[in-house]
Amino acid sequence: MMENWPKKPEGSQWTDDQWKAVVANGRDILVAAAAGSGKTAVLVERIIKKIINEENPVDVDRLLVVTFTNAAAQEMKNRIGEALEKVLIDEPGSQHIRKQLSLLNKASISTIHSFCLQVIRGYYYMLDVDPRFRIANQTENELLKEEVLDDILEEEYGIEDNTIFFELVDRYTSDRSDDDLQRMILALHTESRAHPNPEKWLDKLVEAYDVEGKTIEDLVYASYLLEDVKFQLETAEQHIRKATELAMLPDGPAPRVETLQADLALLGTLSSAARESWTSVYEAMQNVSWQTLKRIKKSDYNEDIVKQVDSLRNKAKDEVKKLQEELFSRKPESFLRDFQDMHPVLEKLVQLVKVFTERFQAMKRDKGMVDFTDLEHFCLQILSEQSENGEMKPSAVALQYRNKFAEVLVDEYQDTNFVQESIIKFVTKDSESEGNLFMVGDVKQSIYRFRLAEPGLFLGKYKRFTQEGLGGGMKIDLAKNFRSRHEVLAGTNFIFKQIMGEEVGEIDYDADAELKLGASYPEGEDVAAELLCIQQTEEEVIDGEEGAEVEKAQLEARLMAQRIKAMVDSGYEVYDRKTDSMRPVQYRDFVILLRSMPWAPQIMEELKLQGIPVYADLATGYFEATEVNIMMNVFRVIDNPMQDIPLAAVLRSPIVGLNDEELATLRAHGKKGSFYEVMSSFLKGAPLEEEKELHDKLEWFYNLLQGWREFARQQSLSDLIWKVYGETGYYDFVGGLPAGKQRQANLRVLYDRARQYEATSFRGLFRFLRFIERILERGDDMGTARALGEQEDVVRIMTIHKSKGLEFPVVFVAGLGRRFNTQDLMKRFLLHKDFGFGSQFIDPRKRIKYTTLSQLAIKRKMKMELIAEEMRVLYVALTRAKEKLILIGTVKDANKEMEKWLDAREHSEWLLPDHIRAGASCYLDWIAPSLYRHRDSEILLELGQGSIPDEIYGYDTSWKVEVVDGNTLLAPEPVQEEKQELLEALREKKAVPLQSERKEEVYDRLMWKYGYEEATSHRAKQSVTEIKRNYQSEEGSDNAFIKKLRAPIQTRPRFMEKKGLTYAERGTAVHAVMQHVDLKKPITEEVIREQIAGMVNKELLTFEQAEEIAIEKVISFFDSDLGKRVLAAKSVEREVPFTMMLAAEEAYQDWQGKSGESILVQGVIDCMIEEEDGITLIDFKTDTIAGKFPGGFDQAKPILEERYKVQLSLYAKALEKSLQHPVKEKCLYFFDGNHVVKIEE
């Protein structure tokens, strides 16, 4: 095949593998692109090569390019556009390239959801959806789900003899609420939607519990758990073998070898049984009997070795004991009874999920909205149809897309899910060996399993495809990294060669997967990767787990602050690729990566204390902000003033300003009843002299509260919020506090959030507050408003997920000692794509519950997937660094942890034993054992090479491994003597003398006045419309006159207002029609209607705007004398933009500045016609006239002439300047009444 592909050009910078990825053709291709390997450049080059191919060029709109984010899609379009423009410079006459540039904007280069949207918009008639549907936001979606689920459960509770439902409720809800049941239904709904056929997946889930006529060996759960049994028995055998080796050492307890050999025989028997069947293992486990260790005189042997032997044997026995208790304490048939008992309950649960899905879809359909999963499923529904055997096959639409797309290219393929894979499959060729699917990704960077991404899709193809592409698809490995120094790459490889394998990690980190150096850097100092392990002594640990976490965050933050400050102050150098030289490091070159953001606030605070600018896009802390908390309490009180805690919080806040004594005084006036009732009662009576101030405060607030409550019933939530801000003065108040801009930004975010909420189909303060409470219950806080831009010279703190795709010269990866988040494994029920549903067996009558086989299998499977995912997350973190990688973790007892980690030194293989890798509870449990097998750890360990092979011990990588004493980090820093004196003076509020040589310069700058003050009060650039308004004084304008003539009409309440377009939107729509109406065709209703429909298709008008166009008024214009002149004109120009310079005094009546100043004026002329005797200017107006003037149009005419005279005069002046011909006539045409007004000077 390779001979038929273009050869790599001489002097090309592409590697052989990159070039292969650019030009390979004729089959499905999977490119495994390692971090920093230039995959985007390869993808763009492949597209360009296809477009400019001389023999078989492909139009860019015949390629489907699927990206992971909208930003990536836009970047891809930009890169393709730039590349095409470069080609055009070399081939300026190429019409083909010019065509591609014009096609680029409508090319299918987008996210999968955007492509789905495109398919649905084109074939909406095949679905039961309104073509004008909108994408629901998360807020609305959550509220709808809650509403639908409440209705369904309420109906179920009302059905008599609903035995199975109440059995389900008894098993999976608490006495207080049915929240757990609701969570189960929603979780099953969400998981099912990640599959191409949700109902089929749900049905399989129920079928798995139908065990009639089956044995335990028939269950998929038992088969999987048997593999786990083998794994644990193998781990136990390794412990015994290690113990035997130690016992046979010269100082070892040799008499115990015989017992250890018996242990090995016992474990061998169990392993043999595990290879046979579940029943065999069960029977073997009932006969387990460990021999008693022979007594020895410990003083005759090395005490440490004896302890190690005994410890290893106990570990082995614990492994077996754990299996006995979890899996083999019950007879096999008892597990089957669990499934039989749970089957009808699970069937009912799935039925509820199906009903929920159906009702939820119906409600969204009624509201004309869809969510992102709907986009995928609707698209799949259009692209597929059912075959005779019930399987999905491509529909006629799918076949059309197959014919259209010459190739489908998928970026970040490792993050694809099952539904997306099906969509891609239906628009590409069936055969992999002759396919047209090009996939790029790195499964080692697949870190979105929580979003239901399925890395197994990538892995399956990677194992199936070959490098030659024989008999199927082709795989290409891009292993060269063009981002990082050798030290970063070698350090990453050294760790991952030891921890990532197929059994534990899902990926074999072999020679093809290793990162290879592709970048060239100048020699650098101090570029070795580092592991800093902080020892947190018992004395330092604050009480409680939460306190310990805070302490760890503080220790790591302080260490990072010290290192950053030292590197900046010392002029540590990094390479600048733009200037091809080394330069001093800046704060923006540093990033601190965290697995999640709970530590970020403490790290930010510590860095700020050290004077280091820092930025983090926090997704938490918003509702904890004092100003937001106070405002939320205000709104809770407006909704229901009987709530004591929110009301007390508001009364105590700066809004009302009661102190503790005043609050107590109020409460003393009524010990019974709510605070609100007591306050109402207090205000009805006459206050005592000493209570008058309290009375005044409360009366002020009470009156405001009544007004707000009334306002909330009639007006919008967002208007209410701004009204509260204004009437309390609280928005201005927080602006004067420290970090005032940030606080005001937070309050604006609350207002914006309310407006977003109101854009949904929900309304009202109560629903809004309930939604916020739901957010807080789920722990989904929002981040505080941004007050610092991302482009500032600051140290950035971000999650590892956020850093994906980014690179930084210096990377700190912190929190490596934090435990993995295994909370999902502890839930009362578990869900898995392959194994379905698993929960405890619960018998509410006997009040017993225990673990089931399905729960154990799913838990084990999920744990192994979690371990694999965490490995990939660590890989992403380490590969963000360009020049310097610093890993930091904190441990409670370094000696104890090191003892555990040093077990790895006893193994001679590159890949650490499965039990070490699978047993990790944090990243340090992988990193430290790996590094402790390298020579650079010997300074710390002083243990020597031992039995570690040379290729591991002497691997070509540089590391600095150090244990840092936490006490040294917490010691206070000394304060310089002069700074101490200054601080003392400030504390005593003494004046501090100004000792600066620039006092005069500072004074001059502060007192300086701008020489063009007048110009600052007027814009240098104006539109014609703004100039027109400037000429209309407030009292003398026609607007004021019209207001006087209008009949007194009261504003219609909002709930009675008709929804529709605004006047401005209607006017824009009419102008658009007048701009695009075809003057060569007959002006009839049918023709105009057809043209309007065409404008909607071209997205020049919306459906709503099209419906509002009064076609008869358009026709009336062309039937008028002026309209006939337009049709008969020599030439007609419409929507003519212009820009001209105008004397400032002409534009501004109040101008008092220098004469000769000019301003830039811009505008758009609706229509100009050229006739034999000159140019006529026409301006279309959609003003409402009928009913506004008692004297009819005769009264309106002089007012309208005056209103638009300046505007048309400027238009005429602009035309005369540009065309060098006089304008003979200026006309206004009013659609309301078919009136023409000629403007005379």
UniProtKB/Swiss-Prot annotation:
Residues 12-485 form the UvrD-like helicase ATP-binding domain. One of its GO terms (biological process) is double-strand break repair via homologous recombination. It catalyses: Couples ATP hydrolysis with the unwinding of duplex DNA by translocating in the 3'-5' direction; ATP + H2O = ADP + phosphate + H(+). It comes from the Bacteria. Transmembrane segments: none annotated. GO terms for cellular component: cytosol; DNA helicase complex. Its cofactor is Mg(2+). Residues 505-805 form the UvrD-like helicase C-terminal domain. GO terms for molecular function: 3'-5' DNA helicase activity; 3'-5' exonuclease activity; ATP binding; ATP hydrolysis activity; double-stranded DNA binding. HAMAP family: AddA. The heterodimer acts as both an ATP-dependent DNA helicase and an ATP-dependent, dual-direction single-stranded exonuclease. Recognizes the chi site generating a DNA molecule suitable for the initiation of homologous recombination. The AddA nuclease domain is required for chi fragment generation; this subunit has the helicase and 3' -> 5' nuclease activities. Heterodimer of AddA and AddB/RexB. This is ATP-dependent helicase/nuclease subunit A. It comes from Bacillus cereus (strain ATCC 10987 / NRS 248). The gene is addA.
